[in-house]
Amino acid sequence: MAAFSEMGVMPEIAQAVEEMDWLLPTDIQAESIPLILGGGDVLMAAETGSGKTGAFSIPVIQIVYETLKDQQEGKKGKATIKTGASVLNKWQMNPYDRGSAFAIGSDGLCCQSREVKEWHGCRATKGLTKGKHYYEVSCHDQGLCRVGWSSMQASLDLGTDKFGFGFGGTGKKSHNKQFDNYGEEFTMHDTIGCYLDIDKGHVKFSKNGKDLGLAFEIPPHMKNQALFPACVLKNAELKFNFGEEEFKFPPKDGFVALSKAPESFVVKSQHTGSAQVAQTKFLPNAPKALIVEPSRELAEQTLNNVKQFKKYIDNPKLRELLIIGGVAARDQLSVLDNGVDIVVGTPGRLDDLVSTGKLNLSQVRFLVLDEADGLLSQGYSDFINRIHNQIPQITSDGKRLQVIVCSATLHSFDVKKLSEKIMHFPTWVDLKGEDSVPDTVHHVVVPVNPKTDRLWERLGKSHIRTDEVHAKDNTRPGANSPEMWSEAIKILKGEYAVRAIKEHKMDQAIIFCRTKIDCDNLEQYFMQQGGGPDKKGHQFSCVCLHGDRKPHERKQNLERFKKGDVRFLICTDVAARGIDIHGVPYVINVTLPDEKQNYVHRIGRVGRAERMGLAISLVATEKEKVWYHVCSSRGKGCYNTRLKEDGGCTIWYNEMQLLSEIEEHLNCTISQVEPDIKVPVDEFDGKVTYGQKRTLGGGNYKGHVDVLAPTVQELAALEKEAQTSFLHLGYLPNQLFRTF
């Protein structure tokens, strides 16, 4: 308790921490908690199981409590608010709502970006909520640009999310990253007219007075949102005309210039030249902290930690809410209406509630992105930027929004780019460094070579069910086609997984498969061996964890594995991201992950203090054809086995290349073992070894002593000689004096 109190943690939280047997803070907690309590933005990276959740939860809970306590006692902070009223009073491009390399002339109408690699955008100072309106844009050079309309929620990269409508110089219209042919190309000296009919919900454009026809119908979710003139440039220059000057091509059919729009139709931008300041009015659906997680399991795990840490906090009590998919929204809305202080959720459901106004972000003091690299890899960068833009940068009591980003690695380009965009001079707390394999983890590769191991030919129909990628192919023995070898690999991997379990008498292991259907097929094969979910204690008792299983089943399966009711957890990479499972003795990679960082996440699950951990990867020596769904259903009911480049949903998976990339990433050679999966035993301590990597990486005490023994003997001889010389020199002067 004293250790946490010394960092400034309040006694109530320290008491709860002590009951959890956390006697001392972990390294990541010791570094991060004081920084967050001090009001800073923090970027943190540490190993799974290092106490990372506590590192951000403890200070967030404390500051939220202190904020509520101040409000309860009527204390108010002072916020200095500047306004850009002079800018917002006229129609022009907004200098406070633009990209970092977007320049605006003194008239507010001439715009330029000379960045040649990145797009930079800008919105106008005013938007519209009603009526029929028009403005013109003239192209001053041959650079790339898109012009159009967007809401305040939209990204400045116009047309790449569901809140903006753009028309580009390449003759493409764009909305929600959908780029379709429209109209015709435009370039230097062309004038583009931008039409907006809010009453009908129509957006269209013209080129040099030529009407190009309807471009977009405004979707229902945007009917009540103000739309602002917007553009995005790459090495280009534009000049806007909102109607203060005479139009080159005046509009017809009742469209009026933006500058002539009635004041009742016009709204001013929220970007006013200083940080947006939160309103002081209490709202029950406006939390003080928002924690975003990439998966349901992680969100539930974090919420449980929050409940534990706040156990002794009272007057006022903190109210928390879990917002995830797969749960009735009405239950979550009911809790929101009664008031919440801390929200933990996943992007999908959070986005729904924020976009419909059910979840209000105007009071948020903390934005926490846990497993940020996972969120970005799942395509949630637009969501993150959108919610960050909606959160006031200054709270009603004058405090600054704090952003905390947790990531498995801070060496990801996407994470660095995100931090530069949404964080304010963040402190980096990197206790993980570049990826490496702990000394307690032995990892080996088992080559799966269907050309040398012909077992797959002799199994008949008793083998594992495969993923039906080759349902229409001739894969019978003798075909000697890539498809035949690919199907053989799938069959052999099922056999090798069973063989590994039997050979090492595995009592507990996590088994990673590449896809959800692979997980289901392996579970079914274990059931054929007599195991399965309902066979407690059986050699092949197992449960599955992946996105297609219902939330309550996923939660139940995770708990059953943790309690030891079943031996094996068969899962996709969802379990490799932060879920509180570590210290298992074995991991089996049925297929290598396509991201090398995920390999380290997977095998990092193994190892205990009293026994070394063993990670076995089954690596195909030939290419395997696998599912890679790019269809709208994301694989549900899809049987399109054509290759991705041919409009299908499959790819050829090259595990040997992936293995090479992993070895290069870790700067080591991973030892290979024979298909019998017998791993060599170290003579000194009886633990498994993984050969060359062990020798290179150190940690083998006996081998280390053998190597150093001759050097130590030589040093001992030199030491003896030096001391003898010193003694000889000490007596020599006395002997010389006596001779005289």
From Swiss-Prot:
The keyword Manganese does not apply. This is ATP-dependent RNA helicase DDX1. Residues 1-448 are annotated as: Interaction with dsRNA. The gene is DDX1. InterPro entries: B30.2/SPRY, B30.2/SPRY_sf, ConA-like_dom_sf, DEAD/DEAH_box_helicase_dom, Helicase_ATP-bd, Helicase_C-like, P-loop_NTPase, RNA_helicase_DEAD_Q_motif. The helicase domain is involved in the stimulation of RELA transcriptional activity. The keyword Nuclease applies. Acts as an ATP-dependent RNA helicase, able to unwind both RNA-RNA and RNA-DNA duplexes. Possesses 5' single-stranded RNA overhang nuclease activity. Possesses ATPase activity on various RNA, but not DNA polynucleotides. May play a role in RNA clearance at DNA double-strand breaks (DSBs), thereby facilitating the template-guided repair of transcriptionally active regions of the genome. Together with RELA, acts as a coactivator to enhance NF-kappa-B-mediated transcriptional activation. Acts as a positive transcriptional regulator of cyclin CCND2 expression. Keywords: Acetylation, Activator, Antiviral defense, ATP-binding, Cytoplasm, DNA-binding, Exonuclease, Helicase, Hydrolase, Immunity, Innate immunity, Isopeptide bond, Mitochondrion, mRNA processing, Nuclease, Nucleotide-binding, Nucleus, Phosphoprotein, RNA-binding, Transcription, Transcription regulation, tRNA processing, Ubl conjugation. The modification N6-acetyllysine is found at residues 239, 268, 281.
